[in-house]
Amino acid sequence: MIESPFAKYRSILVDGDYSAAGFLQSFAMSMYAGAAFPLDASGLRNLDDAHMVAFQEMAAWFRRHGESDPDFVDACKAIKANRAAYARRIKSHLDDLLASDPDSYEGGRGEHASSVRFYQREHETNIARRWID
């Protein structure tokens, strides 16, 4: 029996933390729940040959099997859980920053304000991505 590409490339889909892995994760999620997780296809341009093969295998497999592949569903649930955990960490860090004294912050008030802006933007992006409510 042929192995599901969602099992074959699971480590990339679930544990990958680089741009090509992120694109493949987004591609899988767009097949899993396209209305909630639309795909910016411009990321195709960043795939090297090995990741392009993974993309093509996943697309062909999904075309034949849809959501009936338990490896596909499992990988997507893991991606969704990872993204939610990341978004919660960002929100927690933002909350900690907002509760802290800017004058006691390492780097001073300016660094504190910069960090708040960064984490606020990242949190807002995570809400827009539907990674967190």
Regions found by a protein language model. Name each.
Residues 5-8, 20-23, 51-54, 71, ...:
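Structural recognition of alpha-solenoid helical scaffolds
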